[in-house]
Swiss-Prot record:
Interacts with the inner membrane protein AupB. This is Alkane uptake protein A. It is found in: Cell outer membrane. Required for growth on alkanes. Probably involved in the uptake of micelle-solubilized alkanes. PANTHER family: OUTER MEMBRANE PROTEIN NMB0088-RELATED (PTHR35093:SF8). It comes from Marinobacter nauticus (strain ATCC 49840 / DSM 8798 / CIP 103578 / SP17) (Marinobacter hydrocarbonoclasticus).
Length: 452
């Protein structure tokens, strides 16, 4: 068996030499530590504090800019424009009691995001006067210093399938009211497909010359569709009925992932003559499955309660891995290939308005692990079922002398308990070790919102 890994982190101050070393590391098949994973900010934790605090149970009805990811149609719920800035910090301790490892902590690197989003009504650009809302949300890792966190590697001691640093999170979308309480929206999730080409002549000591490097990152647009129905406005717009206060929503998100392709050609003097050694690596990270979700909520006088059921089609990841040079499942016997299940995630949450200035909210969710196989040679992925609980508070400051609308502050906290699960870890020599994986994750989020 062989060890393969690729690791790439691009920041606003990256240098060509740093990228060269990263590509050269791939070319030399060196192992470097991983910090990224499958999933993304929106589904692993929650985009804004409201999403974090409610365990995403009310996210399909959230009028803030995070609606561009969860349900673009919800952008129509508030006609005012919005400018939001926030931060998210996730502390994680992912464990595996491997007797052959130096400790039981597999990963404890935090995920730290700075977020900014905006929503506005473009209806005034037309002569029709019909509202058309446009919104976007962007999140950058390491508090704005890391534009792309990407890694892919094999492991002989175990690595977690999800969690870790997240790549650039960017969503852009729009929505419009259609008819009597029915709104529709669409957005795109922007991911990056990076390619790197390196040609060089090297000595056995690693000194290179005649280097030629080309790096390119192209955006890939993945569709998100959503609709929101206010049942009272739709079925009894001019009178009271039992449907007043009820809303339902439906969303669809196509699968997405970040990908990197590296092509290199190295001539090693006195060892590998021209045309040299050609190496090609294609791999993915931050895979997010095709997702279908339906939700409903009931709003009373100063309170609301709601929930959603979300189907995530993780089985598609098996096909993605079959063409991945690092995961390399295409060359593995069918009985030993990694397997994934499609999963259903139930979510439930509530919000209560204490007074005109303060509101509290909470939510709970239970997520089964999509990882079906517990023995995955070379990859040795670990993943467990998890219980998610969140709490949050909002404060509205309305004594603003210069601003036209009140300022809103949101805080959210989320705890994720990863349940114990047994795995068989296989090292590169084929020796097997039984391990138990579990973990704890704490997420803190805050934001400030201005209306206009």
């Amino acid at each position: 068996m062989s060890e393969r890994s690729v690791y790439m982190v691009l920041s606003p101050r990256f240098s060509v030499r740093a990228v060269s070393l990263a590509v050269a590391a791939v070319s030399a098949s060196l192992s470097m530590p991983t910090s990224a994973s499958m999933g993304n900010l929106g589904t692993s934790y929650g985009v804004m504090p409201v999403d974090v605090a409610t365990a995403q149970s009310l996210s399909m009805f959230n009028e803030q800019v995070s609606a561009t990811y969860y349900n673009p149609a919800a952008l129509t719920k508030d006609p005012r424009g919005e400018l939001t800035a926030g931060i998210l910090h996730s502390e994680q301790e992912l464990r595996s009691d491997n007797p052959n490892a130096s400790g039981d902590i597999v990963s404890d690197s935090p995920s730290q995001h700075v977020l900014i989003g905006m929503k506005t009504n473009l209806g005034s650009l037309t002569r029709f006067g019909h509202p058309i809302y446009l919104g976007f949300i962007a999140g950058v890792e390491k508090y704005g210093k890391e534009m792309l966190a990407f890694s892919s590697e094999t492991s002989e001691s175990g690595q977690f399938l999800q969690y870790g640093k997240e790549p650039l999170f960017l969503n852009i979308g729009g929505a419009t009211p259609i008819w009597r309480g029915i709104s529709a929206g669409a957005s795109v999730r922007v991911t990056l497909e990076a390619t790197a080409n390196l040609d060089a002549v090297s000595t056995l000591g690693g000194e290179t010359s005649r280097e030629r490097l080309a790096v390119n990152a192209e955006p890939s647009l993945k569709t998100i569709l959503g609709t929101n129905i206010d049942l009272g406005s739709t079925f009894c717009p001019e009178s009271d009925c039992f449907l007043n206060g009820w809303e339902t929503a439906l969303t669809y998100r196509t699968k997405s992932s970040a990908s990197t392709t590296v092509d290199s050609n190295i001539i090693v003097t006195q060892t590998i003559p021209d045309p040299g050694l050609s190496l090609a690596v294609t791999t993915i990270d931050s895979f997010q499955p095709e997702t279908i979700a339906i939700g409903t909520q009931y709003s009373g006088d100063g309170w609301r309660i709601g929930g959603s059921i979300e189907q995530q089609n993780w089985s598609e990841l098996e096909d993605e891995f079959s063409g991945d040079s690092i995961k390399d499942q295409g060359s593995v016997a069918s009985g030993n290939r990694i397997g994934f299940d499609d999963i259903l995630i139930p979510r439930l949450g509530a919000e209560y308005q204490l007074n005109k200035n303060f509101a509290v909210r909470g939510g709970v969710a239970y997520e089964e692990s999509p990882l079906k196989t517990t023995r995955n040679p070379e990859l040795n992925y670990l993943d467990t079922d998890k219980l998610v609980v969140g709490l949050g508070i909002s404060a509205t400051y309305d004594r603003t002398r210069l601003l036209a609308y009140p300022v809103r502050l949101d805080l959210g906290y989320q705890y994720q308990q990863l349940q114990e699960r047994d795995f068989t870890v296989v090292d590169y020599d084929g020796d097997e070790t039984s391990v138990t994986a579990d973990g704890d994750i704490h997420v803190f989020s805050g934001s400030i919102t201005l209306k206009f």
